[in-house]
Regions:
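Glycine-biased, small-residue-rich flexible motifs in mid-sequence functional cores and linkers
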Residues: 45, 50-265
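Short, small/acidic-rich helices and loops at N termini and domain boundaries
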Residues: 1-54
């Protein structure tokens, strides 16, 4: 089963996977071995292949660690902070996500998110505005921008010294089932996860629950009890997430967990 999942992550055609299954386990494992050779499989300029032994420490400790990563740009070293939330964020949520991105990035912590519409993009934007370092984790190949409207944002992340990463091979297009896989990498690469607006059933809430399971610290923005995009955050706070009441409180709390904010390069 693990080998078949590897082939799916690497982008093998479903028909080819079925033919390999009929051919037997040795055929499947042989195909996986050949797929893992980036020199023959992914001659894509600017894309690096990290094997399991080369993964960042935050990922190697996960029980469901990715078998590899594809990387464009650089993966920042040191503690990072993830900022996630609704794709359909309110104007308030978007502005706050941007301010949080500015505050975290300006304090020297890399900002990790998913390059999605809404909160993700706003947090990345805020980080870049102050010269911070951003890291985007995609639910597609690292050469496939999703959504396409955020392509320029992704390029700016690379131009500013940040990175784009994915466990899915180059050329793989986004599909709904890929995003929960992506979310565990977002939380795994971060020491603290901040949730800005999240519905009760949302990818951001999945990321927060994964963060708790991974032993990460979780913070959430309290919101209007009658607003759908606030329900997830309010539930997280009820269950023990640290509420964000001011941006000064945000920095002080992160420093309590991670130590003094690093100097921004």
């Amino acid at each position: 089963m693990s080998a078949l999942l590897d082939l799916a992550l690497l982008g093998s055609n479903p028909d080819r996977i079925r033919r390999l299954m009929l051919a037997g386990e040795s055929a499947v494992r042989s195909e996986v071995a050949s797929c893992r050779d980036p020199s023959t499989r992914w001659p894509v300029d600017g894309v690096r292949f990290l094997s399991a032994d080369e993964l960042p420490a935050g990922l190697t400790s996960l029980p469901d660690a990715p078998p590899w990563l594809f990387v464009r740009g650089a993966i920042p070293t040191g503690p990072a902070v993830a900022v996630v939330g609704s794709r359909r964020a309110t104007r308030y949520g978007l502005e706050l996500a941007r301010r949080i991105g500015r505050t975290v990035g300006g304090s020297g912590w890399p900002v990790v998110s998913g390059l999605a519409l809404g909160v993700d993009a706003a947090a990345h934007e805020g980080c870049l505005e102050v010269g911070g370092t951003a890291l985007a984790v995609l639910g597609s190949g690292v050469d496939v921008w999703y959504p396409r409207s955020n392509r320029r944002l992704g390029e700016r992340i690379l131009e500013s010294g940040g990175g784009i990463v994915s466990e899915f091979g180059p050329g793989i297009t986004p599909e709904p089932w890929r995003f929960p896989f992506r979310n565990r990498i977002i939380s795994g690469l971060a020491s603290v996860v901040i949730v800005v607006e999240a519905a009760v059933r949302s990818g951001a809430l999945i990321t927060a629950h994964l963060a708790v399971a991974q032993g990460r610290e979780v913070m959430a923005v309290p919101g209007d009890i009658d607003r759908a995009t606030s329900v997830g955050c309010n539930l997280l706070i009820r269950d023990g997430a640290h509420p964000i009441t001011t941006l000064d409180d945000l920095v002080e709390t992160i420093e309590f967990w991670l130590g003094p904010a690093p100097a921004r390069p």
